[in-house]
Amino acid sequence: MNIWKSLLAVCLLIAMFGCGASASKKANQEGAAKQLPRLCVTGTQLMNEQGDTVVLKGVSYGWHQFWPRFYNASTVAYLSGDWGAEVLRASMGVDLDSACYVYKPEFGINCVTTVVDAAIENHVYAIIDWHSHNLRQEEAKEFFAQMATRYK
């Protein structure tokens, strides 16, 4: 019975990503000229420029080294277009296995920036998550300095 569930899951994923191509074009055409409103945190609330509380709905990606196949522009287009995601969280796996940021920083940076760049193209907010079970302050400073320079 488990093989049938696995087969169904694979078929659904193929169908889901096959439909994403048209969503990508539509999102790029509609979102290219738009700029996302600035948001800020006041106390415990996310607020827009008018001071109204904002609630975003979205998707959190799993760690990049475990699910890199989803860290691409067509997945972002599908999630923003068909699912209506307004925010995407790209999770940088820092130190869990041999494919994590500590051992393969270029791979991790490529995965995360691919999602963020596609989020910008699709008019979606992006959160970059430095996901580490250990304190790696120096590596985090270096990484976020690079991200801040790229996305300022």
Locate each region found by the language model:
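Bacterial N-terminal signal peptides that target proteins for export
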Residues: 1-8
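Aromatic-lined substrate-binding rim segments of carbohydrate-active enzymes
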Residues: 72-145
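N-terminal carbohydrate-binding accessory modules
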Residues: 21-87, 102
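Active-site-proximal helices and loops of the catalytic beta/alpha 8
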Residues: 28-41, 49, 111-118, 122-127, ...
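C-terminal motif of bacterial Sec signal peptides marking the signal peptidase cleavage site
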Residues: 17-18
